[in-house]
Swiss-Prot record:
Keyword Ubl conjugation assigned: no
Record family assignment: Belongs to the GHMP kinase family. IspE subfamily.
Binding site for ATP: P95, V96, C97, A98, G99, M100, G101, G102, G103, S104, S105
Record's keyword terms, sorted: ATP-binding, Kinase, Nucleotide-binding, Transferase
Enzyme class name: transferase
Pfam families named among the record's database cross-references: GHMP_kinases_C, GHMP_kinases_N
Role: Catalyzes the phosphorylation of the position 2 hydroxy group of 4-diphosphocytidyl-2C-methyl-D-erythritol.
Domain of life: Bacteria
Single GO molecular function: 4-(cytidine 5'-diphospho)-2-C-methyl-D-erythritol kinase activity
Catalytic activity: 4-CDP-2-C-methyl-D-erythritol + ATP = 4-CDP-2-C-methyl-D-erythritol 2-phosphate + ADP + H(+)
Annotated protein name in UniProt: Putative 4-diphosphocytidyl-2-C-methyl-D-erythritol kinase
Organism of provenance: Streptococcus equi subsp. zooepidemicus (strain MGCS10565)
Active site: K11, D137
Length: 283
């Protein structure tokens, strides 16, 4: 079998609601996620030596067991007793530490690619079980698209509707620790997001209701730590974006626009204000 290439799209949160804290210390989340056409690419091929060889065009990334792609390959290799090696190339295009699920999407793409390369014939449930050992975002990233995600991330329900929109992404120069943000959550006072209403809006194709029901429970916490996030949001809205919202625990902010002309205005307004700006579309 020849080399296999899988794309690993970034994701954004149209809605993120914190529903409470679990006895195990994790938080129960309900999210609406959608993929965008900013993608990494994973290429896998057979290797005669019995080892995992991971390389990348991004020198910032570890290429050992600290990388989620490597973890995915190791878990599959051990579980199914694969006696040959594999070479994996990660073509990195999604910003690192951006809150867009880049690492999780890379791991998911590696699982899909290795499932083909090694002819494992894994069921969706088996892939999800492997993915959850790597990270809570991996199950969604295995299937991508537009979906509602609940629990710790392991329950993924596709949404019967399609959001076709231009998206402007801004990745500030700083990162944010997800663990720190979740540590500061007060479930009694945190802002809530009407996820079920958001899902209904997408299913009905009601763009205005979509905008009215979008939100992120973590946004206020992250903005308190990094006020620049609010400045980016303000800049986007002032230049004509339909909505501006932080994705995940940040720091990336995105704007939705119905037309490319509108998206171009938002992009132009950010020149000289932010270095990493991307104009993409929802998938």
């Amino acid at each position: 079998m020849t080399a296999i290439i899988e794309r690993a799209p970034a994701k954004i949160n149209l809605g993120l609601d914190i529903q409470g804290k679990r006895p195990d210390g994790y938080h129960d989340l309900s999210m609406v996620l959608v993929s965008v056409d900013l993608c990494d690419y994973i290429t896998v091929d057979h290797l005669e030596e019995d080892r995992i060889l991971l390389t990348s065009n991004c020198p910032r990334l570890p290429i050992n067991e600290h990388n989620d792609v490597y973890k995915a390959a190791y878990l599959l290799k051990e579980r199914f007793q694969i006696s040959t090696g594999v070479s994996i190339f990660l073509d990195k295009r999604v910003p690192v530490c951006a809150g867009m699920g880049g690492g999780s999407s890379d791991a998911a793409a590696a699982i899909r690619a290795l499932n083909q390369l090694w002819q494992l014939k894994l069921s969706p449930r088996q892939m999800i079980d492997i993915g959850m050992q790597i990270g809570s975002d991996v199950p969604y990233c295995l299937f991508a698209g537009c979906a509602q995600v609940t629990g710790k991330g392991e329950v993924v329900k596709p949404i019967n509707g399609r959001l076709s929109s231009w998206v402007v992404l801004v990745k500030p120069e700083f990162g944010i620790s997800t663990r720190t943000i979740f540590w500061d959550i007060d479930c009694e006072t945190i802002s809530r997001v009407p996820i079920e209403d958001l899902v209904s809006a997408i299913e009905a194709g009601d763009y205005q209701r979509l905008l009215a029901t979008m939100g992120n429970s973590l946004e206020d916490i992250s903005i308190a730590k990094r006020p620049f996030i609010q400045k980016v949001k303000d800049k986007m809205l002032q230049s004509g974006a339909d909505i501006a919202l932080m994705t995940g625990s940040g720091p990336t902010v995105f704007a939705l626009c119905q037309t490319e002309k509108q998206a171009n205005r938002v992009v132009n307004s950010l020149k000289g204000f932010c270095k990493e700006v991307y104009k993409v579309r929802t998938l």
